[in-house]
Regions:
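N-terminal hydrophobic/helix-forming segments and targeting peptides
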Residues: 1-447
Length: 447
């Protein structure tokens, strides 16, 4: 899909973008990105349309001032950058980081379960999923399949069934009168999607169904067999504007495709002579320890090749700043005691700076002050969050990337409700406010 790029300049040549204009592109991106593979494909296409070159990791790179380029890893992580005219050692690099993955249900390698007259699919929980909201939804399946063609060549393709093909029905309350009393879910036994009635089954199993879908979506590929796959269930309900006055945006995968899109738009829209870079890692929701994750060498390798030698890299990183953008917990009106009384971010209140004394976030006083100044320049309100002292908090790619690179980092994010649910909610104004702050990072002459 093509990421929508709306006009952003007023008559004075200043950046101006309404929430409606920005969110139309964001919602299209969310709907077109049911898996990290689809998200990276959409971002890659948007960058290519704006003249970014695809880099081959096995080739020698020729990079100089004015280079606009991108590179992917595993087709689920992406780095894109624009190189300024000044030496990197003298200017550093302005970096925005986000992640492409979201908690979900992944299809197991041998998924076919036949019992009680129905065909079901075995799934594995990916990340910290809120399981209850996955029940009674119209679910589809999307992701990457690896196949062989008629010549025996191996190729990987993206598929998306788009229509609802599986569901996980709840057990009726008449059969579970204690359902509202300390409910627990057994993901092996109770979270098993139903694919269809065995009486109507004509395929030999899930792999045959995949092969038919590949033929439908990629008839030109002459695929003969599906060998393996990385597929996820997802909710077919599209992103929507909600609330009596349209105050909110509800969608799957706001954590963290909202930040990916805001970073992408900032990279594409920035009018700057600075060297700027966007990194969108996979596997954040499961710890980032992978070749495509923030603990892997992907970003360090790209920066090293950009700089040319370790001396230039060290000097460039010493002048660089990373904004790690990952959504933050907004105050929930039904559970307001879950927030520290002095740290209660609100929807439509602007980006949130994340603080944690135990380094679960990489923010320090200097990087927080820099981000506040960027927001002031952009005319964007800014909020802060620190968890209750008796509650643990999550983490982001911020501390990991900061540890790997030694780069100054601030953790921020748009406020949202329902984090890690199948459907999440943010303020209607919050995506564009985050974008405006990130754009200021790329466009400011000095930090």
């Amino acid at each position: 899909m093509s990421v929508s790029l709306a006009p952003k300049l007023n008559h004075r040549g200043e950046h101006i973008l309404s929430p409606e204009s920005f969110n139309s592109g964001l919602m299209a991106f969310l709907d077109a990105s049911p898996s990290p593979f689809h998200a990276v494909a959409a971002m890659r296409q948007a960058l290519q349309l704006q003249g970014f070159d695809d880099l081959d990791p096995t080739a020698t790179w020729s990079i100089g001032g004015g280079t606009n380029a991108l590179i992917t890893r595993n087709h689920s992580s992406l780095i894109a950058f624009r190189v300024g005219t000044a030496p990197l050692a003298d200017t550093g690099i302005r970096i925005i980081g986000a992640h492409t993955d979201s908690p979900c249900l992944r299809i197991k390698p041998s998924p076919d379960v036949r019992r009680s007259g129905v065909h079901q699919l075995g799934v594995e929980v990916y990340g910290g999923v809120l399981l209850a909201p996955w029940f009674d939804r119209d679910l589809s399946i999307a992701g990457r399949v690896t196949c062989t063609d008629a010549q025996g060549r191996r190729l990987s393709l993206l598929i998306d069934f788009e229509r609802p093909i599986v569901t996980i029905p709840s057990l009726a309350i008449h059969l579970n009168r204690d359902v509202h009393k300390n409910r627990t879910l057994n993901s092996q036994q109770e979270v098993v999607p139903i694919l269809g009635d065995l009486a109507n089954e004509t395929e030999t199993g899930f792999h045959r169904m995949l092969l038919d879908q590949v033929h439908h979506q990629h008839p030109e590929s002459d695929v003969q067999a599906v060998i393996d796959y990385e597929l996820s269930c997802y909710d077919t309900q599209c992103a929507q504007r909600v609330g009596i006055h349209g105050d909110y945006l509800a969608s799957a995968r706001l954590d963290n495709l909202l930040s990916c899109y805001a970073g992408l738009r900032s990279l594409l829209d920035a009018e700057t002579e600075q060297s700027v870079l966007l990194v969108c890692n996979d596997h954040e929701e499961v710890g980032s320890a992978s070749a495509a994750g923030a603990q892997g060498p992907f970003l360090h390798t790209v920066l090293e090749r950009l700089c040319g030698d370790t001396e230039t890299l060290a000097r460039a990183l010493a002048r660089s700043l990373l904004i790690s953008a990952d959504n933050a917990h907004a105050l929930h009106p039904n559970y307001d005691n879950k927030h520290d009384p002095q740290h209660q971010p609100r929807l439509n209140g602007g980006p949130v700076i994340k603080f944690n004394a135990n380094q679960r976030y990489a923010t320090n006083s200097e990087t927080a002050a820099t981000f506040r100044e960027l927001c002031t320049r952009a005319g964007v309100p800014v909020q802060s969050i620190a968890m209750r002292s008796d509650m643990a908090c999550g983490s982001t790619i911020g501390p990991i990337t900061s540890t790997v690179l030694g780069v100054n980092t601030v953790d921020v994010g748009a406020p949202q409700l329902g984090m890690h649910s199948i459907r999440e909610t943010t303020g209607w104004k919050d995506p564009v406010l985050l974008y405006q702050a990130l754009l200021q990072l790329f466009e400011s002459e000095k930090l």
